[in-house]
């Protein structure tokens, strides 16, 4: 398979296994959910009745007409413990390497089919210039939420895009399924395409 490089007559030859794969919604959904869950802190915590600070002395006599109560740390009292207290836990889900790579290939293939994958020769930014980056993206017609993927991390490119809330910049090593799925258009350099292919093929 050959993909056209935007702004030139050149083409880049790519593997059908990476950029021509069938889309599996179930697989992509599973990998995206697992990726997002791995980013959850899972640090919420509440105290049970045994962990709440307070006296455990019986609050009132057993007899006398009122309801029977023991410690004031019981869940029915204000300031008491929580009945089924939340505890810190990990939301991490296991995803096999083969599964993850297959999902990434499926996403890239679907982006290509939908015309949302724009390949450029390079995306060099010599100096930090947000206005210049906006003009460059406008010329490519990439929509509101573009994802720029380069072979190596570029500090000038990152700093130029930092103040643009809907523009994301990734190098190949930092590419993830959530960023790909959420982008209107993925702008990727020809060198990055080759590196992605080496990683996923």
Curated annotation (Swiss-Prot):
Name the domain of life: Bacteria
Which UniProt keywords are present, listed alphabetically? Answer: Ribonucleoprotein, Ribosomal protein, RNA-binding, rRNA-binding
Region Disordered: which residues? Answer: 43-69
Could you state a single Gene Ontology molecular function term? structural constituent of ribosome
| InterPro entries with a match to the protein in the record | Ribosomal_uL4, Ribosomal_uL4-like, Ribosomal_uL4_dom_sf
A cellular component term from Gene Ontology for this protein is:
ribosome
- Entry's Gene3D superfamilies? 3.40.1370.10
Annotated GO biological processes are: translation
Tell me which family the UniProt entry assigns to this protein. Belongs to the universal ribosomal protein uL4 family.
Give the protein's function.
One of the primary rRNA binding proteins, this protein initially binds near the 5'-end of the 23S rRNA. It is important during the early stages of 50S assembly. It makes multiple contacts with different domains of the 23S rRNA in the assembled 50S subunit and ribosome.
Cite the record's note on assembly.
Answer: Part of the 50S ribosomal subunit.
Q: Would you tell me the protein name for this molecule?
A: Large ribosomal subunit protein uL4
């Amino acid at each position: 398979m050959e993909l056209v490089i935007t702004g030139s007559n050149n083409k880049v030859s790519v593997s059908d296994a990476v950029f021509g794969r069938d889309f599996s919604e179930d697989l992509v959904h599973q990998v995206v959910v697992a990726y997002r869950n791995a980013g959850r802190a899972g640090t919420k915590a509440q105290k049970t009745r045994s962990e709440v600070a307070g006296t455990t002395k019986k609050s009132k006599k057993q007899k006398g007409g009122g309801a029977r109560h023991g410690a004031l740390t019981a869940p029915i009292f204000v300031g008491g413990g929580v009945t089924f207290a939340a505890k810190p836990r990990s939301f991490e889900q296991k995803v096999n390497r083969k599964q993850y790579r297959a999902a990434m290939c499926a996403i890239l293939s679907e982006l290509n089919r939908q015309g949302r994958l724009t390949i450029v020769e390079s995306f060099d930014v010599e100096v930090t210039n947000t206005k210049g980056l906006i003009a460059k993206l406008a010329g490519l017609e990439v929509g509101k939420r573009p994802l720029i993927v380069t072979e190596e991390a570029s500090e000038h490119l990152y700093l130029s895009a930092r103040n643009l809330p809907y523009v994301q910049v990734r190098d190949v090593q930092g590419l993830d399924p959530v960023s790909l799925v959420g982008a209107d258009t993925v702008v990727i350099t020809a060198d990055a395409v080759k590196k992605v292919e080496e990683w996923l093929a």
